Swiss-Prot record:
EC numbers for this chain: 1.15.1.1
Record Gene3D superfamilies: Superoxide dismutase, copper/zinc binding domain
Record function comment: Destroys radicals which are normally produced within the cells and which are toxic to biological systems.
InterPro entries noted in UniProt: SOD-like_Cu/Zn_dom_sf (IPR036423), SOD_Cu/Zn_/chaperone (IPR024134), SOD_Cu/Zn_BS (IPR018152), SOD_Cu_Zn_dom (IPR001424)
Gene that specifies this protein: sodC
Organism the protein comes from: Neisseria meningitidis serogroup A / serotype 4A (strain DSM 15465 / Z2491)
Protein name: Superoxide dismutase [Cu-Zn]
Subcellular location: Periplasm
Organism taxonomic ancestry: Bacteria, Pseudomonadati, Pseudomonadota, Betaproteobacteria, Neisseriales
Residues at which Cu cation binds: H79, H81, H104, H160
Length: 186
């Protein structure tokens, strides 16, 4: 084997290892996951399946990966709620969609809405969910304070009709408005 061939093989081997290591560091390692069935809420005509959200453990926190369709375009408030229910309940004499889920999950008693990485906010505050013009949502969001699937089992995920400013001002709970879609995390 001549010197040029040997040098070319050595360079090729080094490049292959470098590319493999770079690929390894730029991906989120996959861990255990839960698939949550999500339904659009309709207390009068019954809920309708709109897809799933897969919750996966990663080195950076829990990753919520939606595979949803049939939703209204735009940013939507996306949260973990305290109860494992998507049932309607009565509020002020009116049947309200998804009220059985309770409020935003707040096991540490923060009593305020905020960013997903903010220590003094509800633990159930997630990044807003983006729904494209065709009604689909597939972009994952990261919840860095949530580390294990057992942290969220026995609760529900909720998608609100409006966006989320991650604050209680000017409207409480990010201003997301009514509950639009929900899934129980089992």
């Amino acid at each position: 084997m001549n010197m040029k061939t040997l040098l070319a093989l050595a360079v090729s081997a080094v490049c292959s290892v470098s590319v493999a290591q770079a690929h390894e560091h730029n991906t989120i390692p996959k861990g255990a996951s839960i698939e949550v069935k999500v339904q659009q809420l309709d207390p009068v005509n019954g809920n309708k399946d709109v897809g799933t959200v897969t919750i996966t453990e990663s080195n950076y926190g829990l990753v919520f990966t939606p595979d949803l369709q049939g939703l209204s375009e735009g940013l939507h408030g996306f949260h973990i709620h305290e109860n494992p229910s998507c049932e309607p309940k009565e509020k002020e004499g009116k049947l309200t969609a998804g009220l059985g889920a309770g409020g935003h999950w707040d096991p540490k008693g923060a009593k305020q809405h905020g960013y997903p990485w903010q220590d003094d906010a509800h633990l159930g505050d997630l990044p807003a969910l983006t729904v494209l013009h065709d009604g689909t949502a597939t972009n994952p969001v990261l919840a860095p304070r949530l580390k294990h699937l057992d942290d969220v089992r026995g609760h529900s995920i909720m998608i609100h009709t409006g966006g989320d400013n991650h604050s209680d001002h000017p409207a409480p709970l990010g201003g997301g408005g009514p509950r639009m879609a929900c899934g129980v995390i089992k």
